[in-house]
Amino acid sequence: MPRSLKKGPFVDDHLLKKVDVQNEKNTKQVIKTWSRRSTIIPDFIGHTFAVHDGRKHVPVFVTESMVGHKLGEFAPTRTFKGHIKDDRKSKRR
């Protein structure tokens, strides 16, 4: 179920402060974060976040089309290696 509109989007305070500081200084450094649950707001457009996927930090450059989504949606936590091919010749012998 989506979040109530009267509450507004959830963004961690420390993340919002880091973005505000960079906007004041007009710098665009990578912001390292573990907050996958934070919603992307219009203030984040143009910034790069290093979102933790459980193992490493994945760089995510925020564009207009990402607004309203969560940061964790753009840093997958599982790597799919593919299914193993079924080798029938070796099973028969």
Curated annotation (Swiss-Prot):
Similarity remark: Belongs to the universal ribosomal protein uS19 family.
GN (gene name): rpsS
The protein's name: Small ribosomal subunit protein uS19
Superkingdom, natural source: Bacteria
Name of one Pfam family that matches: Ribosomal_S19
Keyword Chaperone on entry: no
One MF annotation (Gene Ontology) recorded for this entry: rRNA binding
Keywords, sorted A to Z: Ribonucleoprotein, Ribosomal protein, RNA-binding, rRNA-binding
One Gene Ontology CC term in the entry: small ribosomal subunit
Biological process (GO), any one: ribosomal small subunit assembly
Keyword RNA-binding: yes
Record NCBIfam families: rpsS_bact (TIGR01050)
Biological role stated in the UniProt entry: Protein S19 forms a complex with S13 that binds strongly to the 16S ribosomal RNA.
